[in-house]
Structure formats: C-alpha cells, structure tokens
C-alpha cells in the first residue's frame, strides 16, 4: 500500500538529527521526522531531587510546543498558569523512557534535564522527543566524560521511540498528522537497542483492536526503532 506522501505502509518518514544545534546546553540536537521538528536540549545540574537515593543521579524531561507549532496558534502553558494534561503526560513518558537508558549510580549525584521544544508538529512529537532526547542526553554524558567528571559514560542502552497505527484498516508505521487524526488505532512504542520494550501505549480511537493487531503494530514499531537506532548512532559518530 502506498500512502499519501508516497511511503510504503512500513516506512519511516525521512529522519534527520543535527547535533549541537544550540551552543549553551551540555547536549543538544534538532530531530526532524518529516515535517515534525523537535529541539532537544540536555542540561546538567549538580544536585538531585529529594526522593533520589544518596549517591545516585536522576534524568527528567520537560515538553512544550511553540504556540504556532501547529496549523492554528495555541496558548502557551504558562499563559494558562498550568501545564496541560497532554504536556504533562508526554514529559512523564519522555522522562521514564530516558531514565531506562542510564545507570543512575554511574551518573552520580547530578540531574540531567531534557527539554523538548516542538518547533513544528506533524504527528509523532512524543516519540521524536524520546529519540532526539536520547541523543541530547548521550552528548551531555559524553561531555561529563571529556571534562573528567566521569570515567565512562553512564549510558547503558540506546533508546528510540516511534508510532504506528491502523488507518482505513491498514496498519502503518510512523503516522503523520493527516493519518494520525483519522487513525482507528494509535500506538506508541519505546524500545532499547536489544529490542526490549520500555513503554507501550495503545489506544482504540475509533474501535477496539485485537491482540493480533497489536502484535502487528509492535512489529512495525520494532522495525522502525531498529532504523532509528542506526540514525542515532550515525548522529553520535558511532560511539557514546
């Protein structure tokens, strides 16, 4: 099956990761997934939240969208004096996913904050934030090693994320907005380089779905995540 943009049903959009996109954070990248563009920045603090065990570090994330990242302008969360439920859900997902990449004891008593700013949204912003956020995180950890604060990187796994869905009864990988907005089933899948699942979110938007359909969507996501892993490694110069 050929889609509106010419892709096969199991094909990712064109993916590009530009590292060191801004100069002040310890790690940064711009990830482009088709027309979705997310700026990911990693900042290091020499302290941890109160709930973190002594001798361990922490990784957390924040997610937001530029007011005109979509077709119509939306108000910033700060203008509403509270974080939107959607933003809160997404940044928790990104934070959980990236914590799975790190040995917190090896990181030591410091926090790495991952800020994900959607510059343009055309579907898949949360999974793009995971994939790009990991690259920014890895660059920040590399800087800790290069500057002598750590003997080796605390990164233990690569982490990527991608979406899949059922549109017009056809399972598809990496939905753009025109597909996502009419999907009968929507699924987000975060995996490590071993093919293990870190996060799986599946929703019946227009109808319920079967276990066989879920397995097919996960299979598509596994294929997409393997391809994203190669792109991450290329962006990082083949090493952590």
Question: Which sequence ranges carry the predicted segments?
Answer:
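Structured core elements
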Residues: 16-18, 30-32, 39-41, 60-62, ...
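A structural signal for small-residue-enriched, beta-sheet-centric alpha/beta enzyme cores
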Residues: 85, 106-109, 124-128, 138-142, ...
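Glycine-rich, charged/polar anion/phosphate-binding loops
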Residues: 15-18, 24-27, 45-47, 99-101, ...
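Conserved phosphate/anionic-ligand binding catalytic regions in large, soluble enzymes, centered on
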Residues: 29-31, 125-132
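Glycine-rich, flexible beta-strand/loop modules in the N-terminal catalytic cores of phosphate-handling
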Residues: 21, 29-107, 197-219
């Amino acid at each position: 099956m050929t889609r509106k943009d010419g892709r096969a049903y199991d094909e990712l959009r064109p993916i590009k990761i530009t590292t060191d996109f801004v100069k002040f954070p310890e790690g940064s990248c711009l990830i482009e997934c088709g027309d979705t563009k997310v700026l990911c920045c990693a900042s290091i603090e020499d302290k941890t939240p109160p709930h973190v065990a002594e001798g361990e570090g922490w990784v957390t994330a924040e997610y937001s969208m530029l007011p005109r990242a979509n077709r119509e302008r939306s108000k910033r969360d700060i203008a509403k004096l509270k974080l939107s439920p959607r933003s809160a859900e997404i940044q928790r997902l990104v934070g959980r996913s990236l914590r799975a990449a790190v040995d917190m004891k090896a990181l030591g008593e410091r926090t790495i904050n991952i800020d994900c700013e959607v510059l343009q949204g055309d579907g898949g912003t949360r999974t793009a934030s995971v994939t790009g956020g990991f690259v920014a995180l890895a660059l920040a950890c590399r800087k800790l090693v290069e500057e002598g604060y750590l003997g080796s990187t605390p990164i233990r796994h690569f982490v990527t994320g991608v979406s899949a869905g059922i549109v017009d009864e056809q399972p598809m990988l990496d939905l753009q907005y025109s597909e996502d907005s009419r999907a009968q089933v929507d699924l987000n899948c975060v995996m490590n380089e071993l093919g293990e699942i870190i996060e799986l979110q599946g929703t019946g938007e227009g109808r319920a779905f079967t276990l066989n359909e879920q397995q097919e969507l996960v299979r598509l996501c596994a294929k997409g995540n393997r391809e994203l892993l190669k792109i991450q490694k290329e962006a990082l110069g083949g090493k952590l």
